[in-house]
Amino acid sequence: MNKSNHRSPFAIVGRLIVLVKPMLPVMLAAIVMGVAGHFCATFITIFGGFGILRALGLASPVRTVGTAFACILVFALLRGVLRYAEQASNHYIAFKLLALIRDKVFGALRRLTPAKLEGRDRGDLISLITADIEALEVFYAHTISPICIACICVVGMTGFVGSWHILPALVLLAGYLLVGVALPVWSAKRGDRAAREYRQALADTNSYVLESLRGLKDTLQYQDTAARAEGITAHSETLGEKQKFLKYREGLTVALTNTLILLTVLAVLGTSLSLYQSGKLGAEGVLVCTLSALSSFGPVVALANLGVGLTQVFASADRVLDLLEEEPVTADVTDGTDTAFAGAAAEHVSFAYAEEEILHDLSLTIPEKKIVGITGRSGSGKSTFLRLLMRFWDVSGGSIRFGEQDIRRVNTAAL
């Protein structure tokens, strides 16, 4: 597979998000239900605070404790329904788009075959078609709408807390930005290389295992099972080390997220108490601002958790885009000649897989209506020569003729 220069995350997002356009109404519905659901979850705690204020005889927006608990019950029921609807909408979009991407990938493979499937990276292709495309589900189901939901919820909760006093609102906004923007960006930058290495290690392991299965007969015949087993173990250990580092990064991100949330809540509480002591904020304001900080980080935490996950998404998307943009080894000829078979000839043909030369200065004539046997040791290039006759690849040197016509000027359909 052609190696890209590693597209920037913005370039990858631009390519992936274009596919969402036909599903825009469903995406908007998911965003609306997500925002409503998170506000319901947040105000369950806040209305509990309103109930406590009323029970203590302090100023409260609710008239009775019973009203507060009735609102809590309604919010709890709505939260469940809205959460289910949001997730159903997001995954509907994701699975529809993954099916579309798979269709594009198989279309690219049809365009690149047969040379692509005759290469030595079939395990890499299997990894791309399965694991890499499946990884894009994180982007479509857990990235686009959560980012929109978090932005709306941050604005809404900052405004709500700001209605009591601007200082706790600014402290809370700073906490939102640290958890939802600074932390995931830092995590993604630190884990970008590791994610790419993990995806490549997974593809290499798949290729090695598939190669081992395909050559099982030869492995048994030449009693090479111990070496193959050691190779599989080595690939597995390498993959495990890559995954271990990613899990460490993920755990560190979660720990930092929880720490920042706790510090933000304490900062909001401290700011509110300071305002209370100076008479600029009532006791009810201290309670509501603190409860708002405690209960409103849900949408922002979803963004913080994306940091490590998105690095793998971008690594997988980069590999998928590499395949979609890859050019065929030999382009189909449609403006050549439809030459009937009148014998074939190879003249000083050379060919190499990457840097490994298989054929060197081979000349051979295949007469019309004759049977020609090609013999040689295993790996000497017999099958390769037959595929060159079918123009899976172009020769590195020399030429192949059908009759008097160079094979590169014969229409592909006629071959």
Residue ranges and their predicted role:
Residues 54-70, 160-175, 249-318, 323-324:
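Helix-loop-helix
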Residues 27-82, 162-167, 283:
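Transmembrane helix-loop-helix hairpins at lipid-water interfaces of multipass membrane proteins
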Residues 293-355, 394-396, 401, 410:
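ABC transporter TMD-NBD coupling linker
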Residues 88-107, 148-149, 172-217, 224, ...:
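Cytoplasmic coupling helices
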Residues 18-25, 111-117, 131-140, 144, ...:
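An intracellular "coupling" helix at the cytosolic face of ABC transporter transmembrane type-1 domains
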Residues 22, 26-39, 142-197, 270-281:
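Transmembrane helices of ABC transporter permease
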Residues 1-41, 61-67, 86, 90, ...:
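Membrane-integrated ABC transporters
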Residues 339-415:
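ABC-type nucleotide-binding domain
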